[in-house]
Amino acid sequence: MPIIYSLVARGSSVLAEFTSTNGNFVTITRRILDLIPPNDTKMSYVYEKYIFHYLVSDTLTYLCMADEEFGRRIPFTFLDDVKNRFKSMYGDKGKTAIAYGMNSDFSRTLENLMDHYSNTTRVDTMSRTMAEIDEVKNILVSDIAPQLLKRGEKIEMLVERTDTLNQQSFKFKKQSKQLKCAMWWKNVKLMLVLGAIVLIIIFIIVMSYCDGFRSGSKCRSSPSSNSTPTPTPTETPTPTPTPTSTPTPSQLLETLLNQF
């Protein structure tokens, strides 16, 4: 939101205020209220990348804090509208009201006006620049940083919306990294499966020409159509000798007796 914070005050007493964020700029605004003179005037205080715009009218101060690049035309138009709404609702009661006496009702008005003027940026850049020159050429601009830095003050914006966006960004990066890893593993698994299929096909082709693992995977050559078959030699049977019987001693004795 370009308009970050707004308030209505009488001197250093804040009558109503609104902001949609958290931060120490509320404390810094109290320092700035002490520096604002009571006479009617318009002025902008530049501090770091923010500008505190204020106008004083009839002892009441109308102040807002906006981004530096938001310019000054819209913030001062916003402050004029806040002033008119406040006077139409409370008249002169603001001159005697206690601190935060109008906050319960007027803070909602500040919220609506801040939302409206923060989104009123659909203007041609050149016409906006020229209108800003015409409308704020008499508005003084001062750098308030040196006076506040003496006290060691620095604006620390703790915008809840920014924190939410940061968390969403971190979650998105984490999910992207996880998705990238998952896709990488998926590709690796696909390559492994394809490699296994190729190896199986090669193995089947090789095994179709080989004896397998029975003889050390020795491949057999395919038969040639022009080769002459080698004749197988036939073995000639060897005659089995007839065994001769050896005579016994009684037979030998009988033979000798017959000779005599």
Swiss-Prot record:
Q: Which CDD domains match?
A: Longin, R-SNARE
Q: Where is the v-SNARE coiled-coil homology domain?
A: 125-186
Topology class, membrane? Single-pass type IV membrane protein
**Ranges per topology, Cytoplasmic:** 1-189
Q: Where's the Longin domain?
A: 7-110
Which residues fall in a compositionally biased region of kind Pro residues?
Answer: 230-246
Its biological purpose: Involved in the targeting and/or fusion of transport vesicles to their target membrane during transport of proteins from the early endosome to the lysosome. Required for heterotypic fusion of late endosomes with lysosomes and homotypic lysosomal fusion.
Write down what this protein is called: Vesicle-associated membrane protein 7B
